A protein has these predicted regions:
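Alpha-helical structural motif
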Residues: 20-21, 30-33, 37, 120, ...
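Acidic/His-rich, divalent-metal-binding segments that scaffold phosphate/diphosphate chemistry
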Residues: 2-100, 110-111
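Non-transmembrane, amphipathic alpha-helical segments
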Residues: 50-53, 137, 210
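Charged, low-complexity surface segments at secondary-structure and domain boundaries
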Residues: 9, 133, 199-203
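Divalent metal-dependent catalytic cores for phosphoryl transfer on phosphate-bearing substrates
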Residues: 45-47, 57, 70-184
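Long, highly charged amphipathic alpha-helices
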Residues: 64, 107, 213-217
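Terminal helices and disordered tails flanking the catalytic cores of nucleotide-processing hydrolases
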Residues: 153-239
Length: 239
């Protein structure tokens, strides 16, 4: 996991001329309704046999979304909004896996419409609605950060059905990933997903077989940030 500076920690330097975000990660983490959305969504995903999509994933995507924009020089407000969107991006799974990104955006609207400023809410909703590769696109820096953060969370610990990894290629590939790290180089303006894979469990080509669409989306997301996306697996650069 990449860890640089958390919102509000020393090292984050908000621009006094840029208004602060009207809703923060602390606000949504403390909201019992949104907590219910996340826990319920994870139970639905578990029932369908999908990888973990609970609070661990939500908090990690929130943190990395913030860090991506912070490292690349975006405003503290944008980084904070990306953090909120990253935390909430999968709540739509509470209702359905299909079109969960768009469903999630509607749920986010209902939960935040009375406390988030209009522009902030619109930015969060757009990022939530556009984080999946089949229907989404990096429509803003906030959206791009959430995409990169979400797609970088590939890890063995997310797999629930360890006994079926020989049957399901998605579980097998996730189980094979021993370490994932999203490295943001602000000077070179590169965003590199560094994976360590146990090739005894899954071959590198299997990763590309199921994740090619995700990597293409990451490339477009990096371009939205005026950066270049790179992928390394076991130390070898592949994209």
């Amino acid at each position: 996991m990449t860890r640089l500076t958390e919102p509000g920690e020393p090292g984050s330097s908000p621009d006094p001329e840029v208004p602060a975000a009207s809703v923060t990660l602390a606000d949504v983490q403390a909201d019992p309704e949104l907590s219910l959305f996340i826990s319920s969504a994870d139970r639905v995903m578990e029932g369908m046999g999908f990888t973990e999509h609970g609070f661990r994933h939500a908090n990690l995507v929130a943190s990395i979304s913030y860090q991506v924009l912070h490292r690349l020089g975006y405003t503290e407000r944008e980084a904070d909004l990306a953090c909120v969107a990253g935390y909430l991006h999968d709540v739509g799974n509470m209702l359905t896996r299909e079109a969960h990104a768009q469903t999630g955006a509607i749920l986010v609207y209902q939960a935040l419409k009375d406390r988030a400023a209009g522009n902030d809410l619109a930015a969060i909703m757009a990022a939530v609605a556009n984080h999946e590769e089949d229907q989404g696109y990096a429509v803003s820096p906030i959206s791009a950060a959430v995409i990169l953060a979400d797609k970088s969370d590939v890890l063995r610990s997310r797999v629930r059905r360890a006994g079926q990894i020989d049957i399901d290629i998605h579980d097998r590939v996730n189980s094979a990933v021993e370490q994932s790290f999203l490295r943001v180089d602000s000077e070179a303006r590169t965003v590199t997903l560094e994976l360590t894979i146990d090739t005894g469990m899954s071959q590198v080509m299997e990763y590309f077989e199921i994740f090619l669409g995700r990597m293409q989306m990451c490339r477009h997301a990096a371009e939205q940030l005026d950066a270049r996306f790179r992928l390394t697996i076991n130390g070898a650069e592949l994209a």
